[in-house]
């Protein structure tokens, strides 16, 4: 699974026409294959599912922009015109004409389409292990749709299979509630047929599906349902917090005890600026890197996604996570004799979780092919979501909420003396604050602010009733030929 493209499904659609008269019988070409007759042996399903995994690697963009859009980081880069789409999102002046939002839309729908292809033909043949493969496809479709609904709100959905040419002119953008209903249905279909532990690193488990379902419930304020499913994950015993927070984001910490689901990356195959989606590596790592860096431990990069002073100050005194999450380059350079360049909007800080380390082979462009996995769902996320759900459900269980919250804080401070004893709205605020410092640099902050109604007060330039969602790309609206309306305010 580390190198998805090794097994990428290549589907050749061949159209044959034969001119004949009554003296001849049409015989299908012996080796013709198209999308309708592809699934004939178990290996066909296996390769198609791996092809659906492949688009996960493009979610480097989602994780970067989820920070840049928030109050955690500034866009950075070389200048104010370096990647204009990023700069516009940072300043909350983005429009439907934005190459990066177009990429995000296209790549996530490509993932939906690949997963839906497997689902569409799930009943064509039977074989041992098929149910697990179909379950993976259901999870992946849910994962991509969850990203799409977070970013764009109403989107077209098709439960039974793939989209077809012209669907954009026939299918509506389904309401957000309908999108979440499909996400829930897909995950509930997947869970019974997924293993508790993966047979291969990077593959989906029942714990990953339950965790994503719990998160989808939280995003809809379905806290009773969320608390129930997330506690199944907690009580499974399959996961635990890694004792030392600084181990999580190093290469040796990949797929560890805290990993519920990770996007697998490799430096085995390179990419270029002409084809970001071709990379097997985590492009965000190079983009986040230190400009013109020369020194130990780290490698250089493009100085995007730079943490703000406010994000740094959000850490309490004694929080061991601070120096793991945030690299203070001024202090580091003074201590280690390193040198570096100053990029645009230089804050003096870098996202230490996801910047390049020395020793990576980085095939191709070294800043575009980094092997560091994206920790998409960590056990700490499960605990804090469960804490929030228990604090906010119909009949709150604040003891459970505090217990889950304080498990995360105990790891963060190395002591129980920092335990939270608050209740009511103060407890909820403590959980929100904890999410910020636990997941800074991981792409969750913008969406946490939006779903809890705090974005307008925390994000400079944020316009209520507009910036909760991003615009549907201009080309997609045009292709719909008037069938789709643009999101409010765009």
Q: What is each of the regions a protein language model found here?
A:
Residues 42, 46-50, 54-60, 83-152, ...:
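Conserved, well-structured interaction surfaces
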Residues 21-82, 188-191, 203-342, 459:
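An aromatic- and glycine-enriched ligand-binding surface/loop that stacks and positions planar moieties
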Residues 134, 141, 213, 220, ...:
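Structural register within alpha-helical repeat arrays
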Residues 92-93, 310-378:
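Flexible, polar/acidic helix-loop-strand segments at domain edges
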Residues 20-24, 42, 53, 73, ...:
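Long, intrinsically disordered, low-complexity segments
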Residues 45, 180, 223, 396-398:
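TPR-repeat structural position
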